[in-house]
Structure formats: structure tokens, C-alpha cells
């Protein structure tokens, strides 16, 4: 075994320690966690090459104590891509993406019934320990081919997604129905930005995506395009995200729950 997902979706009711006097019964929960740490300590020492993943739902322990033994945790059993944007955005305030268990799940989502594209689901899950949470035997040939491409893409950029410098660029507090994330390599050679449009609207304003963390003196391409931009331009003037006004101009009007991805590469 190389990997163990440690889950425990079970309540502890009528908590009581037979070895504790009445005035120490409130210590039960604390002592229980010390026992979990002790078990983790013995297991990780006996099997140092096994990756343990803990769970936020199973025991509600997404904290630094558990991360010492299990450096990866399942953020939530809510796997809807749109819900997960909010969950992972909040998680990012305390933990790096390499710690987030983030999977593409089936649709309609089993908790909220929402339909989202497999493209958007993957673009949310890329920021984290990427995987799939679905029955592969029910996938269409097209979906199977898409998943192969997604896995290959993630393997190519896994270190950047998990260990790059992570930036929160936009939230619905600052932008209408939008979240924006970015990860930048330590050498500022490569960056990947993501813009999540939750609900679409008619006649959108011109959209510019403002990067962070690039080298202002270097020059970059976006999505292997022919145009070259300085890092200063991408961070201060932003990158123009084309949008159409209606289906008379293009049949590809983005729908609700759309995600744009920007792969930025230095050319000097």
C-alpha cells in the first residue's frame, strides 16, 4: 500500500471514560484525540512510505495536529464543484493546495443536484490533490477521453498546482459572481490562473484578469498565444478575457458555472 484514506463518519455519543473520575469526564474528547495522535505516530513510524489522508468530515479534524501525521486531508464530503470553490477558497487561508483532497465527482451532484461540466469540475479540483470520485463504468466514451486528457494535464503541472505560490484574486465580495485563483512557480517561469464564473449575466462588462506574483521585467505568453505581455502589464493592466454579447455573434456563449484557465509562460 502506498496510500490510505482514513475516514471516520461516525458520531461518539454518551462520551464517557470508565477510567476517569466524574470531575475529569470533560477530558474525554481531548484524551481521545491524544489517542488518535498516538496511533498515527506508531503507524507512520512503522510505515514511513505510506501517505495517510485524513478527513474533515470524519472527525472534523482538519488541523495542524492531524497534518503532522497525515499531510493531506479531504476538505469536505460536499463535492459539488461550485460549493467546492467556496470551501477550497476558505481552506486556502490556512492550508496549502497540496493538503487539499479535491476530486471530480459525478453529476447531478448527490448533495445539491447541480449539473456542472466535467471541464469546470476538473478546473476546480486541479487546485489540490487531484482525483476522481465517480463510477467510471458509467462514463461515456467522450468523458473517458476527456478524463485521460485531464489526468495528463494535471501530471504535467502537478508540482505547480500543489507547491506554487497560491493567490486569491477575486471573490464574490469584490467581483460579481466570480472567484479567481492563481498559482506561480518559484522561479516565476510559469503560472496558471483560473477564473470561475458562478452565474452568467447578459451584456457583461469587459473582463480583465489581473495576475499576481509574476516578474514585472520578464515577458510572457498566455495560453501559448502569439501576443507577448510584460509581467507588469499582466499584473497592472490585466489580461483581456473575450466575451460575446449574444448567440447571434457566437454559439459559444459561456453558461453558468463556467471556468476560464490561463497558462502563462515566460519567454525570456
Q: Whereabouts are the PLM-identified features?
A:
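Active-site neighborhood of glycoside hydrolase catalytic domains
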Residues: 1-119, 129-138
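Solvent-exposed beta-hairpin/edge-strand motifs
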Residues: 212-227
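Conserved, mostly hydrophobic/aromatic
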Residues: 7, 52, 125, 193, ...
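Residue-level detector of short, conserved catalytic/binding motifs and their immediate flanks
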Residues: 50, 123, 191, 220, ...
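Carbohydrate-binding surface patches
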Residues: 172-216, 261
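Catalytic cores of secreted or luminal carbohydrate-active enzymes
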Residues: 119-170
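Carbohydrate-binding/catalytic loop surfaces
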Residues: 20-28, 171-180
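C-terminal beta-strand-rich structural cap/linker in extracellular carbohydrate-active enzymes
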Residues: 231-268
Amino acid at each position: 500500500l502506498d496510500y490510505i484514506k482514513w475516514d471516520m463518519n461516525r458520531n461518539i455519543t454518551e462520551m464517557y471514560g470508565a477510567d476517569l473520575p466524574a470531575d475529569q469526564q470533560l477530558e474525554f474528547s481531548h484524551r481521545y484525540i491524544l489517542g488518535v495522535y498516538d496511533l498515527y505516530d506508531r503507524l507512520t513510524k512503522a510505515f514511513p512510505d505510506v501517505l495517510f489522508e485524513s478527513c474533515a468530515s470524519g472527525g472534523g479534524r482538519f488541523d495542524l495536529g492531524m497534518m503532522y501525521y497525515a499531510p493531506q486531508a479531504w476538505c469536505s464530503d460536499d463535492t459539488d464543484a461550485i460549493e467546492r470553490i467556496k470551501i477550497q477558497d476558505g481552506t486556502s487561508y490556512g492550508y496549502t493546495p497540496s493538503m487539499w483532497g479535491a476530486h471530480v465527482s459525478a453529476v447531478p451532484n448527490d448533495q445539491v443536484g447541480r449539473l456542472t461540466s466535467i471541464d469546470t469540475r476538473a478546473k476546480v479540483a486541479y487546485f489540490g490533490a487531484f482525483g476522481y470520485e465517480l463510477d467510471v463504468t458509467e462514463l461515456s466514451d467522450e468523458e473517458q477521453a476527456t478524463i485521460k486528457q485531464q489526468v495528463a494535464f494535471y501530471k504535467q503541472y502537478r508540482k505547480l498546482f500543489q507547491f506554487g505560490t497560491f493567490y486569491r484574486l477575486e471573490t464574490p465580495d469584490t467581483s460579481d459572481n466570480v472567484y479567481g485563483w492563481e498559482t506561480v512557480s518559484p522561479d516565476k517561469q510559469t503560472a496558471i490562473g483560473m477564473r470561475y464564473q458562478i452565474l452568467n449575466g447578459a451584456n457583461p462588462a469587459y473582463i480583465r484578469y489581473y495576475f499576481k506574483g509574476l516578474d514585472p521585467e520578464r515577458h510572457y505568453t498566455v495560453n501559448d498565444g502569439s501576443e507577448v505581455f510584460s509581467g507588469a502589464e499582466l499584473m497592472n493592466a490585466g489580461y483581456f478575457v473575450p466575451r460575446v454579447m449574444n448567440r447571434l455573434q457566437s454559439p459559444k456563449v459561456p453558461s453558468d458555472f463556467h471556468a476560464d484557465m490561463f497558462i502563462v509562460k515566460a519567454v525570456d
